[in-house]
UniProtKB/Swiss-Prot annotation:
Keyword Ion transport tagged: no
Domain R3H: 600-664
Keyword flag Secreted: no
Designated name of the protein: NF-kappa-B-repressing factor
Chain positions covered by the region annotation Disordered: 27-87, 132-163, 414-437
Region named Active repression domain: 1-296
Keywords: DNA-binding, Isopeptide bond, Nucleus, Phosphoprotein, Repressor, Transcription, Transcription regulation, Ubl conjugation
Expressing tissues: Widely and constitutively expressed. Expressed at lower level in colon, peripheral blood lymphocytes, lung and kidney.
Membrane-spanning residues: none
Position of the signal peptide: none
Subunit structure: Interacts with NF-kappa-B. Interacts with XRN2. Interacts (via G-patch domain) with DHX15; promoting the RNA helicase activity of DHX15.
Length: 690
């Protein structure tokens, strides 16, 4: 007891008028009452703290020892720990601090004997151990504090949206995902080969290993209120925010100038978060102007108030069960199976049912049963309602049951009106002008072997609009109509995935019978008259060779006196024939660093070629070689724009080349093609008379 009093001497805990455990400050003229554990000598008055203002109450953390050896292990005593705790409290948020103080008082309430003025916790039955901490971040708290916390800490109110069973199931999934992350990090294939880890690939691979898929939700920063954007991200005005979720559990949010950048940033933060000690919590998050409960992953011991606003509506987060694939069902019991809408965006019946169930937010399940004749029976359940069944092997029975279920659902579907496609290609002519263009003036522009691309390029070349209109037929068959300037050109019937291609092909064939066709042969075969790198560099060499040495040059006179009569240097004339050209060095680089720039093309040479073409009357486009780099093609684009020319790159990778040409009107190009038959890589094919 004497050791404890010596350690507690001079500790000031401040004023706490709102708690009964701490005595209020005595009025003037009255002596301060001593507690029962103060002894005979009153504590000495201690000078003010050198650090910062203390909070109104702070728990006292001390180290008690029963021997001199234990005292020698901590030579600085409790003063050092008191300073560390003051720094810890200063950096804690206010809400965490209030919870901290409430837990500390709960600990005091759970013990029968303590010193009310000094704040020490004293027990009779259990000895005081060394290094006792009340911080929740300590990995090994004392048994007494654990019991006190379990008795006095109020349990959080249960969530009405997410039951405890759902939270426990999500916690198990996150633990499984965390173990998968650590396993992949130890895999040399994931980290070797490049200095930077592909976090998006790693997270997707780990989540798919847990038999589910990640969910990415994007939102433009312009649609997010400035107050909801982090302070360090307010410089981004045209960027995107990406929220990463998995099984409806919020992981992280990333911000960047593009969608892919925000996704990569969010996945990087998610992988780093999953490497820590984490847990699944139910917190209230802001969505636009409302608040709702959400499942989040946060680090153990950290507060949950720093989460950014949600990008997914709260009504889409209600989880009440799982489907056959393990995916969550969103408010599934509220819908009846007769309201099921089929979205035929797959080739087989199983894919159509699964995609339609995800679209309708309903549950679909396949149940198998072994029959006495060693065959399997598969039954399809939609919203716990048995639709159909199939027999055969385990694989064929599922397909048979899905086919029967799809036929039953198609009979219950309402009669849908014609569904217009959203593809509409418009030229630069104003649509609101009210002038309807005649199909007789149309010119087919063929730039690709794909009929859909040809039809879209034709509409853009003639400044017309093209639409694709779908109509549901019987079964899985659809009818697609091609409408050009409100006039039906062609139609086709087939599967929805391929019917558009077939209808566009019929439309192109119909138009070619009556309309002229302009064929762009640029992408077909090798391109002639290509400007190579050596040809561009040759212009600089020609200018250098123009610097001929005159007869009165001192070097020339010395060579003449030594017997040089012209040509190459040396006894047999095997040396250089032309004098060394003077090369300008504009930057502050040394001569040794100029080796890498030998093959670079000068900008003035490119500009000279394009300037000569712009001033000429040539109608043939300039085609630059595939040898040019991206930076060199970028310079050509800039120079072509400067002289009012159009430029476009074609090809992919090493086969990419650039074409510079004049801006031509459709009428001018047709007139030239009618006169000459072929202009550059353009060719005119007139319709053949029947």
């Amino acid at each position: 007891m004497e050791k404890i009093l010596q350690m507690a001497e001079g500790i000031d805990i401040g004023e706490m008028p709102s708690y009964d455990l701490v005595l209020s400050k005595p009025s003037k003229g009255q002596k301060r009452h001593l507690s029962t554990c103060d002894g005979q000598n009153p504590p000495k008055k201690q000078a003010g703290s050198k650090f910062h203002a203390r909070p109104r109450f702070e728990p006292v953390h001390f180290v008690a020892s029963s021997s001199k050896d234990e005292r020698q292990e901590d030579p600085y005593g409790p003063q050092t720990k008191e300073v560390n705790e003051q720094t810890h409290f200063a950096s804690m948020p206010r809400d965490i601090y209030q919870d901290y103080t409430q837990d500390s008082f709960s600990i005091q309430d759970g013990n029968s004997q303590y010193c009310d003025s000094s704040g020490f916790i004293l027990t009779k039955d259990q000895p005081v151990t060394a290094n006792m901490y009340f911080d929740s971040g300590n990995p090994a708290p004392s048994t007494t504090s654990q019991q006190a916390n379990s008795q006095s800490t109020p349990e959080p109110s249960p969530s009405q949206t997410f039951p405890e069973s759902v939270v426990a199931e999500k916690q198990y999934f996150i633990e499984k995902l965390t173990a998968t992350i650590w396993k992949n990090l130890s895999n040399p294939e994931m980290t070797s080969g490049s200095d930077k880890i592909n976090y998006t690939y790693m997270l997707t691979r780990c989540i798919q290993a847990c038999k589910t898929n990640p969910e990415y939700i994007y939102a433009p920063l312009k649609e997010i209120p400035p107050a909801d954007i982090p302070k360090n991200k307010k410089l981004l005005t045209d960027g995107y925010a990406c929220e990463v979720r998995c099984q409806n559990i919020y992981l992280t949010t990333g911000y960047a100038g593009s969608k892919n950048g925000s996704r990569d940033r969010a996945t990087e933060l998610a992988v780093k978060l999953l490497q820590k000690r984490i847990e699944v919590r139910v917190v209230r998050r802001k969505f636009k102007h409302t608040f709702g409960e959400d499942l989040v992953v946060c680090q153990i011991g950290m507060s949950s108030y720093e989460f950014p606003p949600a990008l997914k509506p709260p009504e889409d987060l209600v989880v009440l069960g799982k489907d056959a694939s393990g995916q969550p069902i969103f408010n599934a019991s509220a819908k009846h199976w007769t309201n099921f809408v089929i979205t035929e965006n797959a080739n087989d019946a199983i894919g159509i049912l699964n995609n339609s169930a995800s679209f309708n937010k309903m549950s679909i399940e396949y149940k198998y049963e072994m029959m006495p004749n060693r065959t399997w029976r598969c039954r399809v359940f939609l919203q716990d309602h048995c639709l159909a069944e199939g027999y055969g092997t385990k694989k064929t029975s599922k397909h048979a049951a899905a086919d029967e279920a799809l036929k039953i659902l198609q009979k219950t579907q309402p009669t849908y009106p014609s569904v217009k496609s959203s593809q509409c290609h418009t030229g630069s002519s104003p649509r609101g002008s009210g002038k309807k263009k005649d199909i007789k003036d149309l010119v087919v522009y063929e730039n690709s072997s794909n009929p859909v691309c040809t039809l879209n390029d034709t509409a853009q070349f003639n400044r017309m609009t093209v639409e694709y209109v779908y109509e549901r037929m019987t079964g899985l068959r659809w009818k697609c109509k091609v409408i050009l300037e409100s006039e039906v050109i062609a139609e086709a019937v087939g599967v929805k995935k391929t019917v558009k291609y077939e209808a566009a092909g019929e439309a192109v064939k119909t138009l070619k019978k009556t309309q002229p066709t302009v064929i762009n042969n640029l992408k077909k075969g090798a391109v002639e008259d290509v400007i190579s790198r050596n040809e561009i560099q040759g212009r600089s060499a020609e200018e250098a060779y123009k610097q001929q040495i005159k007869e009165d040059n001192i070097g020339n006179q010395l060579l003449r006196k030594m017997g040089w009569t012209g040509g190459g240097l040396g006894k047999s004339g095997e040396g250089i024939r032309e004098p060394i050209s003077v090369k300008e060095q504009h930057k502050r680089e040394g001569l040794g660093l100029d080796v890498e720039r030998v093959n670079k093309i000068a900008k003035r040479d490119i500009e000279q070629i394009i300037r000569n073409y712009a001033r000429s009357e040539s109608h043939t486009d300039l085609t630059f070689s595939r040898e040019l780099t991206n930076d060199e093609r970028k310079q050509i684009h800039q120079i072509a724009q400067k002289y009012g020319l159009k430029s476009k790159s074609h090809g992919v990778g090493h086969d990419r080349y650039l074409v510079v040409g004049r801006k031509r009107r459709k009428e001018d190009l047709l007139d030239q093609l009618k006169q000459e038959g072929q202009v550059g890589h353009y060719e005119l094919v007139m319709p053949q008379a029947n």
